[in-house]
């Protein structure tokens, strides 16, 4: 290593006519640090080195005539240094042991208590002790903050957490809940608008049916077109404001609207009576009224707990209080039937007929259905304007 050896050289590198004692040329490893002065003759591993006697031949070298670097050129002995472009094929990626292809699902994040225990235990004694460490305190106290011995980490940690929340934002909302909560009212609104448009056609349809009764066998024509304000031929259901029949058309539609409103109120009354929300006291036997006296309580306790009274306290002429239970369903209908039976005694004769009709065999019911089917077209023309009201009645019946 330190100097030149006096031992005779062996093998290659013994010709000192080419001075290169320190390995100046690339890949010409004559530096003593590589063992040039040792007894190892195989220290130079250049695979394409020139034969040593050819070093003294005259040739055009990189440093002028008469000098040729003996080891493949000034730039080295690699293929790129010799001007040969060798393309090395890229190594294929190692075969994956995972047989599943495509993007794999994101793994579930660990709980906060495992990934950030300091956020879960910020008010504990152990965490306060951990804040004594400058490295931990630097995470929660900003630069230039308080560095006194007394620590009050609660507001600082709260502000730190709030700053983290302001950076990362709120969690992503559940789009499924938002979609379901948005589509529900939208469908209800669409169904309501459709029913409204259909209901608005009811007065016009009933008006057409009403006016057709005056023109049996012919096309209905407005009678006011030949008056002092003549108009073109038009239907009596679409009179212009200048037509004398316009006021009659408005009157007919107003009566139709009142009829539809009365029909809805009757249906609502029947529904409430069926649900037992009309606690009407029945008539006292042998009387036409339900006189309530000074009796405040019933002598017979009520059956069950209900928000409506379950009995009526009456005081006949004998002075004794009498308790009459209120039916849980159809109380108002029974009251009307009792009242009508007292006023019209002949209605009591219909009771056996009604009971017989209810107890008919299925054959009779099928015959009645067949007759209704036979008369169906004419009934449909009469009842078709009221078809849009059926969904509304059904919804009220189900949800009330």
Swiss-Prot record:
Regions of compositional bias (Polar residues) in chain numbering: 96-106
Listed InterPro entries: HBV_HBSAG
Gene Ontology biological-process annotations: caveolin-mediated endocytosis of virus by host cell; fusion of virus membrane with host endosome membrane; virion attachment to host cell
Residue intervals annotated with topology Virion surface: 2-181, 275-348, 399-400
Region: Pre-S, residue numbers: 2-174
Region Disordered, residue ranges: 1-24, 89-116
Sequence segments annotated as region (Pre-S1): 2-119
Record note on biotechnological use: Systematic vaccination of individuals at risk of exposure to the virus has been the main method of controlling the morbidity and mortality associated with hepatitis B. The first hepatitis B vaccine was manufactured by the purification and inactivation of HBsAg obtained from the plasma of chronic hepatitis B virus carriers. The vaccine is now produced by recombinant DNA techniques and expression of the S isoform in yeast cells. The pre-S region do not seem to induce strong enough antigenic response.
Location of the region described as Pre-S2 in the Swiss-Prot/TrEMBL record: 120-174
Modifications the protein undergoes after translation, according to the UniProt entry: Isoform M is N-terminally acetylated by host at a ratio of 90%, and N-glycosylated by host at the pre-S2 region. Myristoylated.
Compartments where found: Virion membrane
UniProt keyword annotation of Methyltransferase present: no
Gene Ontology CC entries for this record: membrane; viral envelope; virion membrane
This protein's UniProt keywords: Acetylation, Caveolin-mediated endocytosis of virus by host, Fusion of virus membrane with host endosomal membrane, Fusion of virus membrane with host membrane, Glycoprotein, Host-virus interaction, Lipoprotein, Membrane, Myristate, Transmembrane, Transmembrane helix, Viral attachment to host cell, Viral envelope protein, Viral penetration into host cytoplasm, Virion, Virus endocytosis by host, Virus entry into host cell
Similarity comment: family membership: Belongs to the orthohepadnavirus major surface antigen family.
Domain characteristics, as noted in the entry: The large envelope protein is synthesized with the pre-S region at the cytosolic side of the endoplasmic reticulum and, hence will be within the virion after budding. Therefore the pre-S region is not N-glycosylated. Later a post-translational translocation of N-terminal pre-S and TM1 domains occur in about 50% of proteins at the virion surface. These molecules change their topology by an unknown mechanism, resulting in exposure of pre-S region at virion surface.
Function: The large envelope protein exists in two topological conformations, one which is termed 'external' or Le-HBsAg and the other 'internal' or Li-HBsAg. In its external conformation the protein attaches the virus to cell receptors and thereby initiating infection. This interaction determines the species specificity and liver tropism. This attachment induces virion internalization predominantly through caveolin-mediated endocytosis. The large envelope protein also assures fusion between virion membrane and endosomal membrane. The middle envelope protein plays an important role in the budding of the virion. It is involved in the induction of budding in a nucleocapsid independent way. In this process the majority of envelope proteins bud to form subviral lipoprotein particles of 22 nm of diameter that do not contain a nucleocapsid.
Protein name as catalogued: Large envelope protein
